[in-house]
């Protein structure tokens, strides 16, 4: 099972940056704020899995998650902080979410989620269900704000996506009928097709500005590096092949959508390259460990036992200095790593985030 890096520092670093391009009233609230709506997996799960009936390995509302800044577990899969002065972007399923919060955005993401409904079925909120939840938010906003204001909110908002990696790991963790009955290329096409459908649906609802990360090098996460116990430290090649296909095909889809959909604009961050560079050359980016996790057990702490999530009998180790590490647990990054990646997504040059970066998307005013 793979569970991808979370949005904690991504979104809140991004929110901090947004502050420079918005006005603030006397109550310190943004009065001209473009919303951020977030879809995806554990890269962006702000705690939705706390509110569904799932297994502990898909949650992180346990110690030591949150130890560095929150001082308590929040359900977010990193030890990163929340430092923004703006209203925080809540998980969609958090009780008592008010419509006023939704005007700033909301995260629909779910740790372990995929674009395919069969990926970890019954344990996560898949991308199609996340879309349905977004449609429910639309209804609430239309009721509260009216059609015209809701249309304005949606047209100015940015829609951020990271999804797909769980679909590519799932066939190697469980029985996938879709994977078994199709070629690898066709399977990747199914994943991308489901993502494309959701993008087009959000566009029909008024969305125009989209941010994407391609699929990261999770074939080389600590968890993946120990999958073949005869080759500890080797990346998991079966998944690498699928991820490579995805990352080659997906940019073509986005270019096609930009040609076909009037006003469609996007930012695509090359997350695979950004994270690969840090895994392979950690010292260049200020890390001592690029392949061993801070929290977990077994070789490279690659067994996902952080916080005794699979039972106290297993136990786990915890590093002394988390800033030395790229990975916090077997699949998720540390705050320091999040900060670096977030800056590349927000304000990165065209060789890493293109054709727009996220800052440019927020500043963009479409007529």
From Swiss-Prot:
Q: What is its main location?
A: secreted
Instruction: List all annotated glycosylation positions.
Output: 175, 194, 321, 351
Q: What class of enzyme is it?
A: hydrolase
Its Gene Ontology molecular function terms? Answer: lipase activity
One GO BP on record is: lipid catabolic process
What are the boundaries of the signal sequence?
Answer: 1-23
Tell me which EC number(s) this protein carries.
3.1.1.-
Keyword set, alphabetical order? Glycoprotein, Hydrolase, Lipid degradation, Lipid metabolism, Secreted, Signal
Task: Return the similarity comment.
Answer: Belongs to the 'GDSL' lipolytic enzyme family.
Q: Which PANTHER family match?
A: GDSL ESTERASE_LIPASE 3 (PTHR45966:SF33), GDSL-LIKE LIPASE/ACYLHYDROLASE (PTHR45966)
Its protein name is GDSL esterase/lipase 3
- Source gene? GLIP3
């Amino acid at each position: 099972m793979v569970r991808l890096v979370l949005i904690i520092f991504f979104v809140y670093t991004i929110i901090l940056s947004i502050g420079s391009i918005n006005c603030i009233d006397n109550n310190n609230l943004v009065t001209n704020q473009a919303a951020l709506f977030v879809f995806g997996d554990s890269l962006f799960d702000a705690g939705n899995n706390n509110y569904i009936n799932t297994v502990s390995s898909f949650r992180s509302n346990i110690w030591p998650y949150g130890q560095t800044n929150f001082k308590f577990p929040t359900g977010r899969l990193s030890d990163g902080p929340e430092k923004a002065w703006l209203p925080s972007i809540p998980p969609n399923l958090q009780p008592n979410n008010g419509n006023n919060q939704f005007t700033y955005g909301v995260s629909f993401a779910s740790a372990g989620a995929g674009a395919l409904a069969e990926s970890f079925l019954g344990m996560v909120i898949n991308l199609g269900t996340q879309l349905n939840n977004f449609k429910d938010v639309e209804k609430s906003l239309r009721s509260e704000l009216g059609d015209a204001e809701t249309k304005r909110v949606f047209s100015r908002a940015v829609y951020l996506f990271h999804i797909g990696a769980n679909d590519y790991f799932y066939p190697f963790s469980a029985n996938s009928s879709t994977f078994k009955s199709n070629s690898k290329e066709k399977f990747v096409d199914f994943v991308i097709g489901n993502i494309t459908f959701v993008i087009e649906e959000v566009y029909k609802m008024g969305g125009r500005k989209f941010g994407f990360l391609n699929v990261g090098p999770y074939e080389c996460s600590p968890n993946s590096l120990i999958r073949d116990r005869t080759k500890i430290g080797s990346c998991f090649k079966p998944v690498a092949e699928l991820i490579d296909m995805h990352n080659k095909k997906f940019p073509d889809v986005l270019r096609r959508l930009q040609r076909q959909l009037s006003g469609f604009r996007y930012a695509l961050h090359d997350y695979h390259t950004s994270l690969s560079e840090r895994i392979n050359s950690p010292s260049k980016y200020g890390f001592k460990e690029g392949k061993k996790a801070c929290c977990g057990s077994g070789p490279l702490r690659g067994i996902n036992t952080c916080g005794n999530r699979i039972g106290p009998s297993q136990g786990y180790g915890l590093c002394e200095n988390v800033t030395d590490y790229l990975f916090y647990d077997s699949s998720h990054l540390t705050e320091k790593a999040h900060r670096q990646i977030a800056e590349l997504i927000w304000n990165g040059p065209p060789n890493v985030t293109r054709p727009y970066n996220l800052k440019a998307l927020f500043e963009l005013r479409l007529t």
